Amino acid sequence: MSPSADTPEISNSADSTVLSLKKSLCSEDSPLPIRFRALFSLKHVATTADDDATRVAAIEAIAAGFASPSALLKHELAYCLGQTGNTAAVKPLRQVLSDLKEDPMCRHEAAEALGALGWADNLDILREYRDRKEEDISIVETCEIAIERIEWENSAERQKEKLRPSDFASIDPAPPMPESDKEAEVEDLGRKLMDTNADLFSRYRAMFALRDLASPPDLPTATPAVLALAKGLSDSSALFRHEIAFVFGQLSHPASIPALTEALSNTNEASMVRHEAAEALGSLGEKDGVEDTLRKFLHDKEKVVRESCIVALDIAEYEKGEDAEYALIPESAGAAA
């Protein structure tokens, strides 16, 4: 969304901040953890700045990072763009999804981000790549889920559903299952999570309902919900498995450590799953043995796994309280306070 004629111009201080963060993000000489911190700082600006011009400038700075050779960084750029709720994010996301030379992990994240934005105008490109012959299965599945999310977002059914309040501020690939008069028990949601006869969107809804029953961690349903989610790491879909690992990263629940460690340690596992498991372990970095596990894979054969472990160890330092803020400027946490 380009600023209109009456939109306030970006202030000098905001312009200086965005330019400085963009420089850190786009510099191949900057350590990867610094680039990630710059990215989440730009996301903060893109979602909280008082004027549209500054928000758009931050989005454009994020999009400039797609020139990087790092698939890990680029997939995180796409995720952040999808969280902005701003039409300025649409063009770069469509370009990434359309680029058949781009890493499938980045293209999948771009498709998911278009779904998170929720606008029906993007159904055309999502249907195109869902139906494209010989398309990577993770992209086909992501487009399928994104289409259903957009259709749900714009449906009359959406207005009737009562959703359980969530501790998490993220825009998820699917909403949790709606509340009913008798709230679904963990066991029931676990069955729905693992029902391979159901469509992925429905299974994702069960996944995010279980996530919300696992937070805060002292809820009586928390550990059972985490253990139910862990069963999803045995699913046949790598996309599904990677989303389970992402949810574990949001929860930072110690009961997930064994399952995440197993996923990261399995060198036959898809790299998109292993990398997500590594980052999730980073959010648990204050727990005994987690940093040692991550260090074991700093020289993994898969670049995205190596880089994820570098970033995860940086996150672990933050989680241990050695840094005041993860972002270079204050960034709201994924889970609402």
UniProtKB/Swiss-Prot annotation:
Primary residence: cytoplasm
UniProt binding sites for Fe cation 2: H242, E243, H275, E276
Record: residues binding Fe cation 1: H75, E76, H108, E109
InterPro entries: ARM-like (IPR011989), ARM-type_fold (IPR016024), Deoxyhypusine_hydroxylase (IPR027517), HEAT_type_2 (IPR021133), PBS_lyase_HEAT (IPR004155)
Cofactor binding mode and count: Binds 2 Fe(2+) ions per subunit.
Residue ranges, annotated region (Disordered): 156-183
Pfam family name, one: HEAT_2
Protein name, per record: Deoxyhypusine hydroxylase
Lineage: Eukaryota, Fungi, Dikarya, Ascomycota, Pezizomycotina
